[in-house]
Amino acid sequence: MSPLESGGQSGWLASWKGEAVNWECDELGHLNMRHYVGKAEEARQFLFIHLGLAHAYRAGAPSTVRTRELTVCYLREARPGARLAIRSGVTRLGEVDADVVHVMEHAPDAHGNVRVAATVEERVEHIALRTQAAFAWPQRLRKAVRIVDAGGIGARGLPGIDAFGPDRDAVIAMGADRVGAGVFRASEADAFGHIRPTSLFGRCSESVGHFRKGFPETHAAGGLSGHGAAARVSGVLLEMRLVRHAPAAPGRAFEVWSGLLEARAATRNLVHHIVDPVSGASFASMVATSGVMDLERRRLVKSTPDALERLRRNVLPGLTA
């Protein structure tokens, strides 16, 4: 039985059930970060449909529920074929916004024990699509919501810095490195033409491997393209908070810029910015806690004192999100 079920909290909803499909897993051999977020996105939609907003995610709807901030905490790997389930609940209901939490769990083992794979916390807004402004929740939803207690759930290692979305020039002035670029595709958008958070996570995921200053040990070892002992370590994401600043749409160009905020022996904090290279505006900013994983032992590797000293030389004192 799930720990949440055993607490007798009826506000939790079984909002998604499936598995980690092989093609969703990356070169590290586990579910890629974007697909944790994608499954949580489905769970959030299922939750609000269940709460009475049946048309909120259909094309042509007058209003929707949109994620403004999202924090993911990875706790246990989901390897190919892993059976997973998500339960979701509302932890706070404001006038026009709400806080929602999703708990992704592995299927019970032979002894009935359930292990949490990840948690996703979202701050969402009720949006009128004609004006793109937040407006009050309907009474039917207010009557349907049962607030859940999510104490002890969520990220713990992220720095408490504000994310205000500096523009491209400001990001460059901070000393961040350009690690990714491309153009958003139609397949990355929701029913209303906005690029989904799962794609923003994914674009960051496929770019951060170029961030040599954040992961010098994996570059020195040859990364995953190396051979033998050199290919046994790789950077891994542990927690990340994303804040959306301006809507991104298909056909819009983007760049990913990254910087090192702080470094410790076992983990390091990074800041990523996804910006429009044409207007300079910020689409989103992300603060992450990452580490280096031994791919054979499947656990984090601590930096030696000398390696940590070298890594800390790459910290950007004025870096913000």
Say what each PLM segment does.
Residues 180-284:
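Structured core of small recognition/catalytic domains
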Residues 2-16, 73-83, 87-167, 244, ...:
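HotDog/MaoC-like acyl-thioester-processing domains
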Residues 55-78:
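An N-terminal domain-cap segment
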Residues 67-70, 85, 235-239:
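A short, amphipathic edge element
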Residues 29, 88, 132, 192-194, ...:
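Hydrophobic pocket/interface hotspot
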Residues 9-14, 61-66, 174-178, 231-236:
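A short, polar/charged loop/turn motif at coil->beta-strand junctions and beta-hairpin connectors
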Residues 34, 72, 242:
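Short alpha-helical elements of helix-turn-helix
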Residues 1-46, 50, 155-220:
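Catalytic strand-loop segment that frames the active site of acyl-thioester-processing enzymes
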